[in-house]
Amino acid sequence: MCGIVGYVGFRNATDVLLDGLRRLEYRGYDSAGIAVRTPEGLKVVKRSGKLSALAQAVGKTPLQGALGIGHTRWATHGAPTDPNAHPHTTEDGRIALIHNGIFENYLELKEALEARGHRFRSETDTEVLAHLLEETYRGDLLEALREALKAVRGAYAVVVAHEDHEEIVAARTVSPLVVGLGEGENFLASDVPALLPYTRRVIFLHDGDVVRLTREGVEITDLEGRPVQREAVEVDWTLEAAEKGGFPHYMLKEIYEQPWVLENTLGGRLREEEGTVELGLALDPREVDRVHVIACGTASYAGLYGKYLLETLARLPTEWDVASEYRYRDPVVDSRTLALAISQSGETIDTLEGLREAKRKGARSLGVINAKGSTLTREVEDVLYIHAGPEIGVASTKAYTAMLVAMALLAVWFGRARGALALEEAQSLLREMRRLPRLVEEVLEKRPLVAHVAEKYHQARDFLFLGRHVQAPTAYEGALKLKEISYIHAEAYPAGEMKHGPIALIDEHLPVVVLATKGPLYEKTLSNIQEVRARGGKVIAIATEGDEEIPRLAQDVIYVPEVHPLLAPIVSVVPLQLLAYEIAVLLGRDVDQPRNLAKSVTVE
């Protein structure tokens, strides 16, 4: 990932590409590049760093041509270097391509290609497709792309150019791709803002679409070559609205980005046959005897989920701390303690200070981080990036679910290395993890039901959230989301704690959100729901599809797909995000910039 632009027409392609990439800068990136079809063939210029470095390089060697592709990259496979930047080319330089997403099976493909004599020049998964195209190309670029894509597995938006063809071909699955329609010219982009100076007629490609762009027109087929019809729409957006992808708020856009974000977090990391994961960490898991989780707010709830998984799957003793308290309690730390610091921004001062305290006492350190180049990335020994992309809404959504997935990956990694997690159980978990992006898509389809529930309860003065075991952090996060953006008072407790105090609050005016998905503690959760009902409370249950018992007990039920109980929080939190959002909108709140809050808290 991150930004894609393609152009074929009559203008100077370099100008269109650089302008489009600038309009996608808000997505974040660490390198950039373009390829232009010139009279001398395809010419590629790419640089790590900011677009200004690329523009400066292009200025020294102007590229003249009316067809080209451009990309801004946020590194997932390989460091942010010039060779790893896109576009990538075939070995003869006649084909260039750019790619958002992850090819999950790139390592096995790379090994097979190297065995057939191909030489790689980068560390990226994307270059694998360039070599596959070199093998499949027989004169028809679109057919070559279709055939090459049959070999890859994962999420992608791919755009390809060839020096002998006045056309661009592209395909998408999960990662977004938009066609812009002009007169005597046509465009491609990963997001609408790149297209707005040139056209407002666009086609949003669907999963499995393959497209050929020429100056004269656009041809769309599926992966088998069958023609498909896609409706062209007129976008009437301001630039700000375009950056929101047509959504009214960044928060809602980011909620809907979660399927492909989870693809990115998982991408290339699952090794199902071996029952393990590839995290690229230098840390030796056998040298860790205990973990101290250090985080704030939403990230701390991801860390609490991580504690449950590390202890369950890896039998690794794990302490969970609010970062602002950690260094003041004089924690017991030694050289076999791992300080696990979790932060979206990598700049949260309380987390940084907690980490520094642990390091002063001799702890090893690992960061689970979204923002590359942040302070936290420089202060930890190792980093597990979550690859969620820029998150602009102050209330975290996609970064949270990506952190949960990162915690699950880390727990499997430790569990297998420590001999605590059996092969069959690990394989089962990894298979379930691969399903998560699709399952989250299914949950997003429940938005109309969630909106109906929000309409019923948006005037409530208080909410109570309850969950057990791994769903306790989900309850905490659901309450936090509601507080952050609706300004409604909300509390969360492990469901078993309700009778130790909070039960005194329950009456006919209190909505109680209960995480009641299937799992080992399901029957105990049902008992908690009955306790709430007996005192007049209104129960909103998050339940597993097919559950016939819950509707007899709860006033409102939002179903989520069945998944391994340890992974249920990743799908269960999505309706809570939507519920908070819908209530805040009904109350007229500033969803993206709620009062008194900042995206990154850099003061103690």
From Swiss-Prot:
<feature type="domain" description="SIS 2">
    <location>
        <begin position="453"/>
        <end position="594"/>
    </location>
</feature>
<dbReference type="GO" id="GO:0006487">
    <property type="term" value="P:protein N-linked glycosylation"/>
</dbReference>
<dbReference type="Pfam" id="PF13522">
    <property type="entry name" value="GATase_6"/>
</dbReference>
<dbReference type="GO" id="GO:0004360">
    <property type="term" value="F:glutamine-fructose-6-phosphate transaminase (isomerizing) activity"/>
</dbReference>
<dbReference type="GO" id="GO:0005829">
    <property type="term" value="C:cytosol"/>
</dbReference>
<feature type="domain" description="SIS 1">
    <location>
        <begin position="281"/>
        <end position="420"/>
    </location>
</feature>
<feature type="active site" description="For Fru-6P isomerization activity">
    <location>
        <position position="599"/>
    </location>
</feature>
<dbReference type="InterPro" id="IPR046348">
    <property type="entry name" value="SIS_dom_sf"/>
</dbReference>
<dbReference type="Pfam" id="PF01380">
    <property type="entry name" value="SIS"/>
</dbReference>
<dbReference type="InterPro" id="IPR035466">
    <property type="entry name" value="GlmS/AgaS_SIS"/>
</dbReference>
<feature type="active site" description="Nucleophile; for GATase activity">
    <location>
        <position position="2"/>
    </location>
</feature>
<dbReference type="InterPro" id="IPR017932">
    <property type="entry name" value="GATase_2_dom"/>
</dbReference>
<dbReference type="GO" id="GO:0097367">
    <property type="term" value="F:carbohydrate derivative binding"/>
</dbReference>
<comment type="function">
    <text>Catalyzes the first step in hexosamine metabolism, converting fructose-6P into glucosamine-6P using glutamine as a nitrogen source.</text>
</comment>
<dbReference type="InterPro" id="IPR005855">
    <property type="entry name" value="GFAT"/>
</dbReference>
<dbReference type="GO" id="GO:0005975">
    <property type="term" value="P:carbohydrate metabolic process"/>
</dbReference>
<keyword id="KW-0677">Repeat</keyword>
<dbReference type="InterPro" id="IPR047084">
    <property type="entry name" value="GFAT_N"/>
</dbReference>
<keyword id="KW-0315">Glutamine amidotransferase</keyword>
<protein>
    <recommendedName>
        <fullName>Glutamine--fructose-6-phosphate aminotransferase [isomerizing]</fullName>
        <ecNumber>2.6.1.16</ecNumber>
    </recommendedName>
</protein>
<dbReference type="InterPro" id="IPR035490">
    <property type="entry name" value="GlmS/FrlB_SIS"/>
</dbReference>
<feature type="domain" description="Glutamine amidotransferase type-2">
    <location>
        <begin position="2"/>
        <end position="216"/>
    </location>
</feature>
<dbReference type="InterPro" id="IPR029055">
    <property type="entry name" value="Ntn_hydrolases_N"/>
</dbReference>
<dbReference type="InterPro" id="IPR001347">
    <property type="entry name" value="SIS_dom"/>
</dbReference>
<dbReference type="GO" id="GO:0006002">
    <property type="term" value="P:fructose 6-phosphate metabolic process"/>
</dbReference>
<comment type="subunit">
    <text>Homodimer.</text>
</comment>
<keyword id="KW-0032">Aminotransferase</keyword>
<keyword id="KW-0808">Transferase</keyword>
<dbReference type="GO" id="GO:0006047">
    <property type="term" value="P:UDP-N-acetylglucosamine metabolic process"/>
</dbReference>
<keyword id="KW-0963">Cytoplasm</keyword>
